[in-house]
């Protein structure tokens, strides 16, 4: 059995880490380098950095902070936001990122997934999916969620898009469940179950973690990683305590 991963998510805006609720009303959480160092030293298995404005504003990720993060931490990290080409990905990987993640650019150009997988290997290519459950319990994929004024339904349904990106060469999927984001009431287990059944690649749950038990629930469903932000940024959950709790519950985790 593969070791499960605890992942901290850092939404980056103008070199600062921010956190919103349901992808809105972001508040400042601190300096990106200092937070990255804190997590690297305190037991997080992996970091994901989302430049939340890059795709929406059609900008490139600032390479300076990516390089600085790589110099200051000793754990794997993934970078996302505005990656629209092989050259964009190559530059970020050259600056020290272990993986790159694409979201809205993949919706605009699905073949980008295949090109990146071919150029850099599937292990480097993560697809982020921002999924929203509407009033009819329909699971819909949203795009440009980094800007609440531009965020809208992409026209795709979540389960169909999951199947498509896996076929195109995604090495991992991060499922960002928008309804739960920042609410700290637990991951959407029903949605995770549906996605796990059709997703043959590593799956990371994102959106809703508020207690140690929420991570346990997700891992019991078979996800490979559980991602959280506000509970870690605000130190509401101690990472080492979380890992010991999970180990005691029979989850294979790196202590």
Curated annotation (Swiss-Prot):
BP-aspect Gene Ontology terms: L-histidine biosynthetic process
Keyword Amino-acid biosynthesis: yes
Any one GO CC term of the record: cytoplasm
Subcellular location: Cytoplasm
Pfam families attached to this UniProt entry: His_biosynth
Tree of life domain: Bacteria
Residues annotated as catalytic: 11, 130
Substrates-to-products reaction catalysed: 5-[(5-phospho-1-deoxy-D-ribulos-1-ylimino)methylamino]-1-(5-phospho-beta-D-ribosyl)imidazole-4-carboxamide + L-glutamine = D-erythro-1-(imidazol-4-yl)glycerol 3-phosphate + 5-amino-1-(5-phospho-beta-D-ribosyl)imidazole-4-carboxamide + L-glutamate + H(+)
Keyword flag Zinc: no
Keywords: Amino-acid biosynthesis, Cytoplasm, Histidine biosynthesis, Lyase
Main localization (coarse): cytoplasm
This enzyme's EC code(s): 4.3.2.10
Leading EC class: lyase
Pathway assigned to this chain's UniProt record: Amino-acid biosynthesis; L-histidine biosynthesis; L-histidine from 5-phospho-alpha-D-ribose 1-diphosphate: step 5/9
GO molecular function: imidazoleglycerol-phosphate synthase activity; lyase activity
Subunit structure: Heterodimer of HisH and HisF.
Family indicated by similarity: Belongs to the HisA/HisF family.
Function, in words: IGPS catalyzes the conversion of PRFAR and glutamine to IGP, AICAR and glutamate. The HisF subunit catalyzes the cyclization activity that produces IGP and AICAR from PRFAR using the ammonia provided by the HisH subunit.
NCBIfam families: hisF
HAMAP family from the UniProt entry: HisF
Designated name of the protein: Imidazole glycerol phosphate synthase subunit HisF
Lineage of the species this protein comes from: Bacteria, Pseudomonadati, Campylobacterota, Epsilonproteobacteria, Campylobacterales
Underlying gene: hisF
